[in-house]
Amino acid sequence: MFAPIVRQHPGPALVTSTKPDLFELSATERVRRGPVRVLDPDRLAPSGTRVRWSPVAGCEDSRVAERRAQALVAASGDDTGSTAQFFRQSAADVLKGYLHAAALDGRTMRDVLAWSARPTDPTPMRILAENPGTAVDWAGTIGTHTSGAEQTTSGVMRTLARALACFGHSDVMEMCCPAPGEQFDVDEFLASSATVYLLGKQPSAGAGGVAPLLTAFAEELLDAAERVAAGRSGRRLDPPLLALLDEAPSICPIPSLPQRLADGRGRGVVVMYGMQSPAQARDRWGPNGAEAMNDATTVSVILRGLRSVDDLEDLERLCGQCRIQRHSKSDSVGGRSVTVASELEPVVTVAEIRSLEVGVGLVLWDDFPQVLAYLPGLWEDRKGWKAISVEEAATRAANDAARHPAALTRILVE
């Protein structure tokens, strides 16, 4: 469903996915439009040109440090309970201080990770206390959360460790500590028709995963899009930026997504997102955030496979009712009579929504009546699919070769 959109978009594109398929189906076409890069800590598409990006860059600005810390920590768990929220907010308060201190003192994510492993290390607090450009009392905030009651402190630092877990891998850390001149240029990206793919596996239960890194990068890019749009004619990007967030709750749960959906279109930022069910949005952004996302989403496409009875019933009610006339005939001594009864029935039932045909979507668009739409796959364009399938196979082979170079060498030798 998403591949044709990515292939045809005329402007810059930010694309997320938990599988390499979307990259393999669209990357070759995107190269024809502009540079293609991947932020791919799990090596789902290792043949792609890698993004080098430092989460510390720009954090001399306390507002940037705060937003980046929020994005990193928010993506580390989907428990919306009050205790979990307290620990996440406290961890973000510590992390924003670490990022701010690292940027002010010319340090890197290696230092941030080291400080998080040694909460009693006074270095970040000293940097903040001695630097006149620091935010007000962020050093004290770090001290409050790292030297308080043991149970509270351990909870905060466990949450922080989960948010930074992916940086413990040497290849990921190397990716996030670019040399001078290697840092991903966001402004250059937005001025082109380039593409960046953010790829990562679904995190397993209890694991930190790569979602924090991908989310922080996406948030940075969308923040930059708003800034650049403000200086453009009409205060919007033209052509627009496409932010296509497949599996958004799992791999790229941008904290500000509800707000981005509400006002992105006016800035030339087209946000599309995919999820398994509405319940995922409630788990990740909370009931209020999920409701705000739903209200700000102009077009919703529901595909087969939804299993939650509550969600199915909500959709049935949303589609409304229609009046049906039923005719019944009866014979009697006096002759035949016809009775007409009028009843209200759902336009689309729970059973019909749950068992939609493959390739058919229930489309809800603003206040227009819902429709069932056929969504043709790329393969149905026989002429075009022949070329696309060749491109896909070549990209997949390149990925396989990059994952297993030794095996490829043996095959060539034999």
What are these regions (language model features)?
Residues 1-269, 351-372, 382, 387-414:
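P-loop NTPase motor domains
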Residues 29-32, 55, 287-290, 316-320, ...:
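Short secondary-structure boundary/capping segments
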Residues 261-365:
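Conserved ATP-driven motor cores of ASCE-family P-loop NTPases powering translocation/secretion/packaging/pilus
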